[in-house]
């Protein structure tokens, strides 16, 4: 017990992948193991950190997965199509699949939470930016 997992189903904190883009104000910690020859996760769980007074991108994003957001710390504004929902620590919301959305942090502290994508999407290939002129 407590030893290393030989199945690749356990992700240790020291081995977690952290994704961010240059000049980005958000970091994604992949909590779900990456797909391998023996296992392809059906859901993707990430921990996100979004800096104060920032958003997760310039354009809304659209993807084929349902996204469940659980905010642990700070505040988030979740804009889905034209409706904004304010989340405070402990709140959750669901973004239905294929709806354009963008997340912003209106607060003075870093927003930290979990996002669950079902079915799993593997960055960056399945994330598509969306603008009113169509998908890009």
Q: In which residue ranges do the predicted regions lie?
A:
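Short, charged recognition helix plus adjacent turn
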Residues: 2-27, 132
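A short glycine-rich, His/Asp/Glu-containing loop-to-beta-strand
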Residues: 17-59, 116, 121
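Short, conserved beta-strand element in jelly-roll/cupin
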Residues: 47-51, 61-78
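Short histidine-centered beta-strand/loop micro-motifs
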Residues: 56-63, 104-106
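Short acidic-glycine-tyrosine-enriched beta hairpin
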Residues: 81-97
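Short, charged beta-turn/beta-strand-edge "cap" motif at the junction between a beta-strand
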Residues: 99-102
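Double-stranded beta-helix
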Residues: 106, 111-136
């Amino acid at each position: 017990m407590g030893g290393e997992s030989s199945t690749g189903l356990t992700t240790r904190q020291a081995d977690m992948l952290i994704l961010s883009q240059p000049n980005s104000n958000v970091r994604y910690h992949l909590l779900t193991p990456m797909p391998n020859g023996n296992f392809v996760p059906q859901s993707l769980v990430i921990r996100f950190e979004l800096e104060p007074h920032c958003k997760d991108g310039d354009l809304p994003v659209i993807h084929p997965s349902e996204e469940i957001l659980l905010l642990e710390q700070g505040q988030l504004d979740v804009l889905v199509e034209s409706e904004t929902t304010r989340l405070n620590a402990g709140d959750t919301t669901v973004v239905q699949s294929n709806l354009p959305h963008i997340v912003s942090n209106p607060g003075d502290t870093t927003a930290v939470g979990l996002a669950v994508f079902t079915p799993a999407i593997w960055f960056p290939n399945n994330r598509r930016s969306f603008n009113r002129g169509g998908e890009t």
